[in-house]
Design a protein with these regions (language model features):
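Loop-to-transmembrane alpha-helix entry segments
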Residues: 99, 115-147, 157, 265-288
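Selected transmembrane alpha-helices and immediately adjacent juxtamembrane segments
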Residues: 153-186
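Membrane-interface interhelical linkers
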Residues: 1-23, 27-71, 77-90, 138-160, ...
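Hydrophobic/small/kink-forming positions within alpha-helical transmembrane segments
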Residues: 13-17, 45, 73-78, 103-108, ...
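C-terminal appended segment following the main domain
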Residues: 229-293
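Membrane-interface helix caps and helix-loop-helix hairpins in membrane proteins
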Residues: 115-119, 177-180, 241-242, 292-293
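Specific alpha-helical transmembrane segments that line the substrate/conduction pathway
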Residues: 71-76, 87-136, 188-197, 245-265
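Small-residue-mediated transmembrane helix hinge/kink sites in multi-pass secondary transporters
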Residues: 24, 84, 110-111, 176, ...
Length: 293
């Protein structure tokens, strides 16, 4: 990875862990994110207005870009719904290590679909990142804790967490393809637009009046998370233009380091020795990815 892409992904990971932290504390329903992505479409309007790029980007958008953007947004919507359902059904220690295993799947799709060639150093680094995340999520070092998520493979939360991991890896590869075809800001705006429509339709099929209730209850939180989510996503898209998507997705798991720190400091989580061990392994993995070609 290039030094600039590493910096961008680290900043993105910090922002990502922050908005995830607020989301977990708030226990927001899926309808909350309709408003997040609606606000996301408005956040980019000043950039388009002052830069004057929007008409040109709109005219240059190919049918392939539109098609892949819609597919990516649908997959991201499925990812978001699956992740929220998983967190609603089970404890974090079961869902987190499975849902954050996306780097393992991403390298498979990246090799098969877009022909990325990964170095041995990079592959080992990705493996250590996943192991580090798994250990961070453990309650302790007993064998029962190690195999706890694996014993739940037939449970609905496991299924939704696995769906989140797979869909997260697929849309990341699609993002990589799309940002090679257009400006990252325009693509990010498209994703916000399409996901807003998709989540709006999903909400209407659930309860017709819930969107108004969600807006009335969480106005400030909606705007804050829209700002943080879009900043994090945009930085990753820019990094994808410079580096391999397999490395970017794996390096983004640095957010687990920040998340563990936030959990210990503000949520008073225990088992800091387990967290620190996982964080050390994760850090070694990140260093290897940073050195990988």
């Amino acid at each position: 990875m290039t030094p600039l892409s590493i910096i961008l992904v680290l900043i993105s990971a910090l922002i990502h862990s922050s908005w995830n932290f607020f989301t977990k504390r708030g226990n927001f329903p899926i309808e909350f994110f309709f408003w997040v992505f609606l606000w996301g479409t408005f956040l980019y309007l000043p950039f388009f207005y002052f830069s004057g790029l929007f008409p040109g980007l709109l005219l240059q958008a190919t049918p392939k870009l539109w098609t892949l953007s819609v597919i990516s947004s649908l997959i991201q919507t499925l990812y978001l719904i699956s992740l929220i359902k998983a967190y609603q059904m089970a404890e974090l220690s079961l869902v987190y290590p499975i849902s954050r295993s996306a780097p393992l799947f991403t390298q498979v799709w990246a090799v098969l679909l877009i022909g990325e060639i990964l170095s041995i150093t990079g592959v080992v680094g990705i493996g250590l990142v996943v192991v580090g995340i798994f250990i961070i999520s453990m309650s302790d070092f007993r064998l029962t804790a190690v195999f706890h998520p694996l014993r739940q493979t037939s449970s609905p939360p496991y299924f939704f967490a696995l769906i989140a991991a797979v869909t997260g890896s697929v849309y990341s590869v699609l993002d990589k393809v799309c940002v090679q075809m257009t400006h990252p800001v325009f693509y990010c705006w498209l994703i916000n637009l399409f996901m807003c429509i998709e989540l709006g339709l999903y909400a209407l099929f659930q309860k017709r009046n819930i969107l108004i209730k969600v807006w009335g209850q969480w106005k400030k939180e909606i705007f804050l998370i829209a700002l943080l989510q879009n900043a994090s996503y945009l930085l990753v898209l820019v990094a994808m233009q410079m580096s391999k998507v397999s490395y970017v997705v794996a390096f983004r798991q640095a957010g687990a380091l920040f998340g563990a720190g936030l959990g210990i400091l503000f949520l008073k989580e225990t088992q800091w020795k387990t967290r620190m061990t996982g964080a050390l392994i994760l850090t070694i993995g990140l260093i290897l990815i940073g050195l990988a070609k």
